[in-house]
Each structure stands twice: as structure tokens, then as C-alpha cells.
């Protein structure tokens, strides 16, 4: 378990502005603090060379440490609900997903010395449980609930203290039943807290306990025939508030990002967009391992000095037992160069805390030898999951918050053992993208660093001042505003260098009501670790259709010329120049080179041992690649590790020859406004960038021409 870690309130910030840090220290003693700028974040001694620059800190060298908890499990909470004295009825419609896991709260009430809960009991049946003065009475239906079926549950505490619980399946199943138990204490009549999808706190968690897995619809509290509270989850689907339609308006706040816009018990299959008929989406799916904003208090705040260059930064925190780097990115106070490097922080966040069982043990020996950070998400489940994981009930993780430590999004870190290169770096995210910073720095090319989150907030105005925008190794996730801004930038003559693979692939949506949260839903098709449930393909945050940009009419091919076509392990192969390299339109690429068609380059690299590998993009005119595009090089990866993307899998055979899809197409095209696009089509291109050779020279030539203000003429 990580003993010293933290997070920031923003991925990046401008010079002169303030960024806030939230740190938990298990030692509860002061920790050391320093700030570093990363030129290269790869700790591999066989790599380009780890390079950090320590900066004079405006903050103390030691900071008082406090320990803060990290809790998982979503629920809804309403406070100060006025309960009448005497009898009460609790009611809900549920779709449980793990009824056999043990007690799980569905709707509970508690006040000092008394509580009442509608729940799933220890034997898997519906249960009503009352506690007063430390004495608990419970009635549980003998028949266990079945997973992924709808039930109506009604629990009544009578004035004489009798508990009655009934479960009624919506389908003709044999698990209907009723149970009773005498001797409970009626409601004393006082303001109470209501919890939906959990029981009152117990043990070490001060917030709630016995978290429920599954959907809940229309939880309600009645006193006889009088409505005390009824929460309608069909209202305010885009918000983090559950609306009480009763007279008290005891609206409940949602905790830890449960999933909304979920099909409810009345869903017919005729509606797929929740906005068309919210009543069919009146359910919330809660999970016992959901996690939102951890809410740690601010530990220290940094007003970024105006003389710190734009770049990759980290707060390095350490004590005698642990250390961590908390990354952040510095923007100039106003644009200061012709080049913007766009950090794919949306993709960082979606992938963050990708739990892969055994990964920590797998890399431990090599990571220790390299002096890399040793903490991994599988070793720290308290910090939640990524959108590549499944919840404990088997459903996909669709919501993630940046307000938690993201342990696999750090500098000086390994991610995996390179399968093809004995000295491969096995890096990802920040460490890989730092190869581009290393290149720009050592080539002496001035650049500003901006983030995806900046782009969503500011749109085209962020990009417009720059002559060139560089998209990094794996810019996979984008919001609608980000895609539109990139399109508008190109339409105005901007130049875009896309130096990775599997980019511009999935739609992602931020929330106006849950700061720091992102949502993705994996609709229809695509390379993915899980798929959305039927009828749940529209985002709850923005209400837009989810899934691949290609399915929404914005394939990457239209934006950058190529698009995701092939995936395999981290095993790289060389590129070979095509006839396109001799076209006069790209003569600028060959300065200092004498390329010939068929000539190989990118034969080595710090990722997979070659420049074409892992996730590859190819040109496809059917999907929108411009007709005048030039393929200047192609990396063909015919290997058993590699297969085509499943959105192209219409039958058991691919419609194209393997060399047309198992390839990375490095391509170039001009835009009507005098701009241009250069795309490399491979995630492992980045690993070859620190190596002096043809690939680096070619990339540098492209950038220098893109910086040149002379417009690109439209080809004849």
C-alpha cells in the first residue's frame, strides 16, 4: 500500500497561476518537497537517459504530513429527513448484480440510537432490519434474489414493532416471498439520514458500509399512505443529485460517481436515447468499487513562477519510507512559441489506475534495478479503477475522477516488460510522451505545453496562436469540443503532427456537475475490454451518443489521414519508404537524407525494438482519408501477435489483404487553407525518437517546415 502519494486539482496551469496539491502521508510526519522539470522521464539506463532539472522552490523544503483515507463504493445521501413517529414503509425496485456477496444496503435510515434498513440479507434474499439501543431485529425472505433480474421490494415496520419484507420478481420466477419478525422498535420520529445503496457507517469507513451492486429505481419512504420521500432518478440525469419528489424535497447527493442514464424496469427496447423518454431510464447503477473525488484537503499550493519554462513538471515528495512524483504541466502565461505540444491528459485519466493483476510483481525486479517507482495500481486497490477495468459485478467502469492518485501516470516509471527487446523501456503515458519533450529540447525547438483539459475548456482559441500542434503518442480520447477545435484549427491553416497511434478513437465527456470526472461508454464496437449494456449507449454527462468517433461520423482518417486498424503486443518493426517519398510535395522531409523506396528505417527503438508497433493506424479512403494524401512510409507488422480491429470484422475474413491493415502508414496531406497534416500511424514511433537516425531527422524536417509560415500549396 502506497504510504505517500497525492494528486492535483488540475492537470496543468499557467505561469503565475496556482495549482493545488492534496497529499496523504501514512507516516503523519513532515515529508520532503522539491519541484522538478522532466526533459526525459524514462528511468531505463539503456534508454535516452533519465533527465530532470530541479527548480528553486518557493515553498518550504518540508511539509507537514497528514493521512487521508481512500474509500470506494457509491451511494446517495439525504440529510435531515424528517421522519414521523411510529410505522414506516421502505420501498424500492432493484436489479441486483451480486446478490450472493453478503449484506448490501438498498435504502437505510439512521439517527442516534435507531436505524431501519431495506437490504439484501446474508443469505441473498430481501431483508428488512431494525436496530435500536444496540439490539437488531431482521426479517429476510428465504428465497435468494437472482442476479440481473428486476424485483419490487417492500419492507414495513408496523406500529407494534413487526417487520414484514416482501420481494416480488417482475418475471415469473420462483423466488417471490415474504418474511416477518416481531420485536422491533418503531420509529421514534426525528430527523434522520437516508442512504441509498449502502448501510450506515461501520468499521473503518466513516462514510457508509455494505455497498450495493446493481441498479436501484424509485426508492421511497412512506408513513402509512403518506409519502415521506420518493426519489425519482429519471430527473436530473446529468447531475449528481437524486431528486425527491416528496413534500420535503430531501434531494440526495450522489457519492463516488454511480452510473446514471441506465435502463430501468420499464425499458421496452424501443428507446435508446434516454433524453427521448427519461422515465425508461429511472435507474442508477451503484457499485461497491466506484470512486469519485476523494476530497482530501489541500496540503500545499504552488503559484507557478513566471520564469519556469512551459513543460512537464512534478512535485517530488519523499520521506524515509516512501516517495512519489505528482505530475503537472506548465503553460506559458500567454503563447510564447510557434509550436504547441498537446498532452493527452484525457487519455491519461481514462487509463489511470489500470489494475492488471500481477503487474507489480512482474516488473518489480527490473523496476528496482532501474530506480523506478515501485507502486502499481494492482498493489493499491484503494485508489480505484480505470475505464479499462470491470467493476466487481462485471460491469465496465465508465466514470473516473482525476481527484485521486493515479499511480500509473507518473514519471520515472515502468509499465511492463518489453516482449521484444531485452533492454526495452516498457514505458507508457508521461514517460513515453517525454521522449518528444526530450527531442524538442535537444533540437533546440521552442515549444509550449498544453493539455487536453485546456483544449476542452478553451477550444479553438487555445490552438489558434500556434503554427504547429503536435499530438502525442496515444491521444485516444476526445470530447466533441476538442474534435471540433482541431478541425477548425486545420480549416484555418493550422499544421498538425500526429506522432502516435490509436488516436482520435473514442468519445469522452466531462461533467458540468462532477468537477474532474470523465465518462466513456463503449458502444457498438471497437477494441475494448468491455461493452455497454443494451440501451445504454448515450452518455449521462453530455447526453451525446457514445463510442467510436468513426461511428459518430468523425473518423480519425478525416482529421489526420489515417485511423486505427491493427493491434498487437509491444513488438516493433521497421518502416520502409514508399514511392511517395520521392514526390516533390514532400521534398522538405528528405533534407539530409537520401531515401529510396523500400529502404528501411526505425529498426530500433526503446519500445518494442522498432518504430512500427503496438497500435497502428492506416490510410483508408472509405473512412475519409483525403484523396490527395501521400503515404511516404509503411511499417508492415505481419506477426501472430497482431490482429485487426473488430469494427472492421464483418465476417471471419478481413476484406483487405493483410499488408493493407497490419501496417502503420506514415502519411502527409495539405489542407485548403495552406496548412498540412503529418501522421505516423504507430505508437512505438515515439520509442525511436530519442535515437539519432533517419526517423528523427525525418520528423525534425517535418516540424521545421511546418513552423515555416509559407503556406502549403494545394496539389495540382
Where in this protein do the model-derived segments appear?
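Ligand-binding face of N-terminal immunoglobulin V-set domains in extracellular IgSF glycoproteins
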Residues: 5-30, 37-41, 48-50, 55-74, ...
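Extracellular glycan-associated modules
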Residues: 15-20, 26, 40-270
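Aromatic-Pro/Gly-enriched surface loop or interdomain linker
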Residues: 28, 38, 262-292, 322-462, ...
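Short, surface-exposed beta-strand/loop micro-motifs that present aromatic residues
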Residues: 115-119, 438, 663-671
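Short, solvent-exposed loop/turn and secondary-structure capping segments
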Residues: 34-35, 44-47, 103-105, 118-119, ...
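Glycine-rich, aromatic-lined ligand/substrate-binding cores of catalytic
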Residues: 514-706
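Helical hinge/lid and interdomain linker segments adjacent to catalytic or ligand-binding clefts
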Residues: 289-290, 301-303, 307-309, 422-512, ...
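Short secondary-structure boundary/capping segments
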Residues: 92, 170-172, 247, 355-359, ...
Amino acid at each position: 500500500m502506497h504510504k505517500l502519494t497525492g494528486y492535483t486539482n488540475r492537470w496543468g496551469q499557467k505561469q503565475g497561476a496556482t495549482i493545488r496539491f492534496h497529499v496523504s502521508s501514512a507516516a503523519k510526519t513532515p515529508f520532503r518537497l522539491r519541484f522538478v522539470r522532466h526533459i526525459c522521464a524514462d528511468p531505463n539506463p539503456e534508454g535516452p537517459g533519465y533527465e530532470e532539472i530541479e527548480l528553486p522552490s518557493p515553498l518550504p523544503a518540508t511539509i507537514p504530513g497528514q493521512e487521508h483515507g481512500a474509500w470506494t463504493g457509491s451511494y446517495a445521501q439525504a440529510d435531515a429527513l424528517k421522519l414521523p413517529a411510529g410505522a414506516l414503509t421502505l420501498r424500492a425496485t432493484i436489479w441486483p448484480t451480486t446478490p450472493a456477496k453478503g449484506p448490501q444496503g438498498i435504502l437505510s435510515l439512521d439517527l442516534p440510537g435507531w436505524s431501519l434498513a431495506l437490504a439484501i440479507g446474508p443469505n441473498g434474499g430481501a431483508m428488512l432490519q431494525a436496530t435500536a439501543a444496540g439490539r437488531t431485529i431482521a426479517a429476510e425472505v428465504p428465497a435468494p434474489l437472482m442476479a440481473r433480474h428486476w424485483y419490487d421490494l417492500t419492507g414495513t415496520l408496523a406500529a407494534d414493532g413487526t417487520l414484514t419484507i416482501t420481494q416480488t420478481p417482475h418475471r415469473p420466477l420462483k423466488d417471490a416471498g415474504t418474511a416477518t419478525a416481531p420485536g422491533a422498535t418503531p420509529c421514534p420520529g426525528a430527523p434522520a439520514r437516508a442512504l441509498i445503496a449502502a448501510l450506515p457507517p461501520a468499521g473503518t469507513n466513516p462514510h457508509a458500509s455494505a455497498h450495493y451492486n446493481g441498479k436501484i429505481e424509485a426508492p421511497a419512504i412512506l408513513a402509512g399512505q403518506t409519502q415521506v420521500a420518493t426519489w425519482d432518478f429519471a430527473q436530473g440525469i446529468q447531475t449528481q443529485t437524486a431528486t425527491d419528489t416528496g413534500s420535503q424535497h430531501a434531494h440526495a447527493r450522489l457519492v463516488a460517481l454511480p452510473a446514471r442514464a441506465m435502463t430501468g424496469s420499464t425499458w421496452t427496447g424501443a428507446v435508446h436515447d434516454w433524453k427521448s423518454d427519461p422515465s425508461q431510464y429511472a435507474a442508477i447503477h451503484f457499485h461497491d468499487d466506484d470512486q469519485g473525488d476523494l476530497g482530501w484537503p489541500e496540503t500545499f499550493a504552488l503559484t507557478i513562477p513566471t520564469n519556469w519554462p512551459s513543460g512537464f513538471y512534478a512535485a517530488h515528495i519523499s520521506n524515509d519510507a516512501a516517495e512519489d512524483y505528482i505530475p503537472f504541466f506548465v503553460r506559458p502565461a500567454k503563447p510564447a512559441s510557434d509550436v504547441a505540444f498537446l498532452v493527452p491528459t484525457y487519455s491519461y485519466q481514462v487509463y489511470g489506475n489500470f489494475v492488471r493483476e500481477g503487474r507489480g510483481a512482474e516488473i518489480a525486479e527490473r523496476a528496482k534495478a532501474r530506480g523506478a517507482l515501485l507502486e502499481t495500481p494492482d498493489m493499491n486497490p484503494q485508489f480505484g479503477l480505470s475505464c479499462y477495468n470491470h467493476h466487481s459485478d462485471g460491469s465496465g467502469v465508465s466514470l473516473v475522477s482525476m481527484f485521486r492518485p493515479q499511480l500509473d501516470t507518473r514519471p520515472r516509471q515502468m509499465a511492463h516488460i518489453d516482449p521484444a527487446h531485452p533492454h526495452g523501456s516498457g514505458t507508457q503515458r508521461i514517460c513515453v510522451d517525454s521522449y518528444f519533450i526530450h527531442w524538442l529540447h535537444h533540437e533546440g525547438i521552442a515549444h509550449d505545453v498544453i493539455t487536453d483539459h485546456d483544449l476542452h475548456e478553451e477550444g479553438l482559441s487555445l490552438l489558434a496562436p500556434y503554427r504547429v500542434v503536435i499530438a502525442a503518442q496515444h491521444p485516444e480520447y476526445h470530447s466533441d469540443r476538442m474534435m471540433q477545435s482541431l478541425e477548425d484549427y486545420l480549416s484555418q491553416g493550422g499544421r498538425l503532427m500526429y506522432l502516435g497511434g490509436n488516436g482520435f478513437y473514442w468519445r469522452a465527456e466531462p461533467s458540468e456537475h462532477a468537477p474532474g470526472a470523465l465518462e466513456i461508454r463503449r458502444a457498438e464496437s471497437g477494441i475494448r475490454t468491455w461493452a455497454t449494456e443494451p440501451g445504454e449507449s448515450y452518455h449521462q454527462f453530455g447526453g451525446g451518443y457514445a463510442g467510436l468517433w468513426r461511428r459518430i461520423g468523425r473518423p480519425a482518417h478525416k482529421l489526420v489521414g489515417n485511423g486505427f486498424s491493427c493491434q498487437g503486443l509491444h513488438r516493433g518493426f521497421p518502416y520502409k519508404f514508399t514511392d511517395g517519398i520521392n514526390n516533390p510535395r514532400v521534398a522538405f522531409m528528405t533534407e539530409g537524407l537520401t531515401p529510396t523506396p523500400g529502404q528501411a528505417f526505425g529498426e530500433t527503438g526503446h519500445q518494442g525494438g522498432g518504430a512500427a508497433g503496438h497500435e497502428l493506424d492506416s490510410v483508408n479512403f472509405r473512412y475519409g482519408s483525403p484523396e490527395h494524401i501521400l503515404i511516404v512510409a509503411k511499417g508492415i507488422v505481419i506477426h501472430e501477435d497482431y490482429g485487426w480491429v473488430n469494427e472492421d470484422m464483418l465476417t471471419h475474413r478481413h476484406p483487405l489483404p493483410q499488408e493493407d491493415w497490419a501496417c502503420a502508414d506514415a502519411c502527409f496531406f495539405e489542407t485548403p487553407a495552406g496548412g498540412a497534416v503529418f501522421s505516423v500511424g504507430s505508437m512505438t514511433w515515439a520509442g525511436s525518437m530519442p535515437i539519432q537516425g533517419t526517423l528523427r531527422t525525418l520528423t525534425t524536417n517535418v516540424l521545421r517546415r511546418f513552423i515555416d509560415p509559407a503556406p502549403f500549396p494545394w496539389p495540382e
